[in-house]
Amino acid sequence: MRSSAPMPRMSRRGRVTIGVLVGVFVLFTLLGWGVQAWTDWLWFGEVDYTAVFSGVLVTRLLLFVTVGLAMAVIVGGNLWLAHRLRPRLRPQSPEQATLERYRMLLSPRIGLWFATVSVVVGLFAGLSAQSRWSEWLLFRNGGNFGVKDPEFGVDIGFYIFDLPFWRYLLGTAFTAVVLALLGALAVHYVFGGIRLQGVGDRMSTAARAHLSTLVAVFVLLKAVAYVLDRRTMLLEYNDGANVYGAGYADINALLPAKEILAYISVVVAIAVLVFSNAWMRNLVWPGISLALLGVSAVAIGGIYPWAVQTFEVKPSARDKEARYIERSIEATRAAFSLGEADATRYAASNLQPPASLATDTAVVPNARLLDPQLVSETYTQLQQVRGFYDFGPKLDIDRYTVDGETQDYVVGVREINYGELTTQQSNWINRHTVYTHGYGLVAAPANRVVCGGQPYFVSGFLGERSQEGCAAQTDQIPASQPRIYYGERMEAGDYAIVGKANPEASPAEFDRPVGEDGSESYYTYTGSGGVEVGSFGRRLLYAIKEQESNFLLSEAVNEKSKLLYVRNPRERVEKVAPFLTVDGDPYPAVIDGRVTWIIDGYTTAATYPYAERINLQTETTDELTNRGTFQQARENINYIRNSVKATVDAYDGTVTLYEFDDGDPVLRAWNKAFGGDLIKPKAEIPTELSAHFRYPADLFKVQRNVYTRFHVTNPGDFYSGQDFWQVPNVPDAPDSGQKQPPYYLFTQMPGQDEPRFQLTSAVTPNRRQNLAALMSGSYVDGKPRLEVYELPEDTRISGPVQVHQQMTNNAQIRQQLNLLSSNQAQVQYGNLLSLPFGNGMLYVEPVYVKSNQQQAYPLLQKVLLSYGDGGSFVVLADNLTDGIKQLVEQGEQAGAPSPPPSDDETPPSPTPTPTPTTPSVTPPPLTGEVAEAAQRVQAAIVELRAAQESGDFERYGRALQALDEATAAFEQAAASTPAATPTAAPTGSPSPGG
């Protein structure tokens, strides 16, 4: 029965219009892709990494075609088969009458419809598959780790290299079968193979055989999924123990359940085929079989493990989960390279400044006073010379040996900041052909200030004269090629066009100011970097890419021109090594006379069995993130290695990748994937370059944060969580919630033979503010070393936040700080350094002052120092030398230090510290009102100490206010009593904690 109503048809003009629009869209899309691919090929050719471009491109195309074609064939083949199996005769019914209209529409072009659906499905599947290029390359080129998982004895390499791609293939197979099943079901229904109305069998024999086969394949895939789930269980979170990896209930209940369900799935798949086609030939028993599978999955795979977890594990979780917590601890320490951390006890029992502070040559002289974040503004104002030069929001720390002395320097490069060009300077010609580069690496010793608090600059001069004593008169870190064409300030659109057609023509690029008269020199780029854009075809290509007609119209682009782009060092490394996670803080160094950017590269994975999984962005974010350091992507990982040290030449952009961790299987797999020679072996690292390697910041932050929990190796203690640590907040702004960044120092830690350049950080116990440990990362003989100095649990040594508050809340010091901040000047605090010394702890915190004048910059004016518990011995001095002298004097006046306490004793309180101005004569006794006032001061001091030890900051504030009031009352009483001399002060310093 056919309907008399014809189906609407589109007019010829409408079809032509749609065809033209689709054609234009496809043309422009292909043009954009083509231009991007061509320019990428040229760029990779410039940096000599075409193997990466071609390898990734070929892999993506291979996956796109293979998976897309397979998906199209599976879906399209089942659509064709369903149509091929349609019944020739269909009983008449209202349902079939309605479907007849659709059959009339589809039948004339049924092949076209099936092809269209297949192409669309294949296109989406291919696009999804091509993004899995990294998983495929690791699957093809991965090897063994040489370490087996603790449950199945399978090499870790299977989980890192094979399992991710197997899971993707399984997911793709599920998608293909489901789409084929839905498509076949629809075709069978439209063409009468399935009927919802009428009498007799509702499904033809052919349709039943077809659909039951697809269902059986789906169930067989589910069996494979159950098998893979057994391996995947070692990667999942264990709520019962708060660690990753299979726990007691997983191993003893869920693991056998998965195996049983896999067997049941195979049986059900066979039953579906047999009951649907060979025996009974209906859907009742296949339906019952599928229902039994569902019930089994709920009962065996859900209820049973839940019951074991609830009634067997939870009542004694500490004991039941101990074995699996131990697995997680061992795996996590291995995956994050924490197993080799050298943990030692540091008693820190000396609470009084030792006399050796004044004669030390390893720790005190190397205490860094310049904060690379604060003095960036100072560098810009004093070394900018022109308004468009910039040093960025944060400088870097490196070490150099000058005149036989090695120390750390604050370094920065004078880059072009295109955002600071004036309106006249920022036209296309000036922006891209004149202001093309910066000039010079500017450095200053990190422990020295001159001329009212300025850094003592020793390099990067532009020929200007500096006041004698305020800067070195000769370049102490000379660079034979100081020009900066590639730097951190470069963004996506900051390309430069260099080169001149006529060798006799005057240089067009602004080079640098010369002399005191404001004259300028110009320059022509002669480096090997850049893509040649002299031909018309190349100029047209980049005109399309940059959407800029001046590539074709401007005379500044000539036959000798080169285009420099992707000029950010970090982005260059990411582009040539897309398999690396790049550290967020590149730093410059002068290597063989050239300014070179050094960037740390990490290999990561997320499928290390039993290892803790972290979010890389969360674990590396602190106060400096997006303030001079790049923020990492939100990537979940549970394995990381600093496998590569990369360099980028600041002049010609040359990118070099050096192997640093020669034992990393992940790096070996990537190197193999790209021909085996992509990364230079470790033996080829130049000695001068390796001398500037530093422990990478992001890796250290990850290791530090993970170690705050996984330093606990006893499963029972780990489960209770009582010994966990935390990273303290920024000392001078604890309420901001930002974590204190680690800091680089050239210093000597306890047990070290000589000073090293190391990255250090303090950690505190959970929910407490005293110091728990110091962590240090450094290189010894070219190998990374992580060291931890753990303090006793009952230590009185304060943590960074507490120390800063104790120092700045000292009555005398607070008065001086208030004077510094008068006239709306800003008092800014530099890095608070925690330095183990003399079996105690020395704290150093530089104090900067920035006036309220326009274009003012921070100047180092004072240095806060503390020794011991953080509050008993505190000074605010003009410089480090004077501060150390005052600390030593306080220690001498306080008397000989008490012997270290035994393990079962509480460390004795130090003798109260007299103020530096207190004479050593015995004061006369106090009487009357003065004596009462003195007693109130003493009582306030006792309360202040108690509040400090309790860690209750609200109580501490009240006690501090009471001390101020008592001190003021005492001074007033002493002034009104002639017999009371200034020496008749109450015993005990009124400083916090004193």
Swiss-Prot record:
Start-end of Pro residues biased regions: 897-926
Keyword Ribosomal protein assigned: no
Q: Which GO CC annotations does the UniProt entry carry?
A: extracellular region; plasma membrane
Localization, UniProt: Cell membrane
In which broad location class does this protein mainly occur, judging by the first location in its UniProt entry? membrane
Q: How does it sit in the membrane?
A: Multi-pass membrane protein
Annotated stretches, region: Disordered = 891-934, 970-994
Q: Which residues cross the membrane?
A: 18-38, 61-81, 110-130, 174-194, 209-229, 260-280, 283-303
Q: Per UniProt, which keywords does this protein have? A: Cell membrane, Membrane, Transmembrane, Transmembrane helix
Q: Which InterPro entries match?
A: UPF0182
One Pfam short name: UPF0182
Q: According to its UniProt record, which protein family does this protein belong to?
A: Belongs to the UPF0182 family.
The molecule here is called UPF0182 protein Strop_3729
Species in which this protein is naturally found: Salinispora tropica (strain ATCC BAA-916 / DSM 44818 / JCM 13857 / NBRC 105044 / CNB-440)
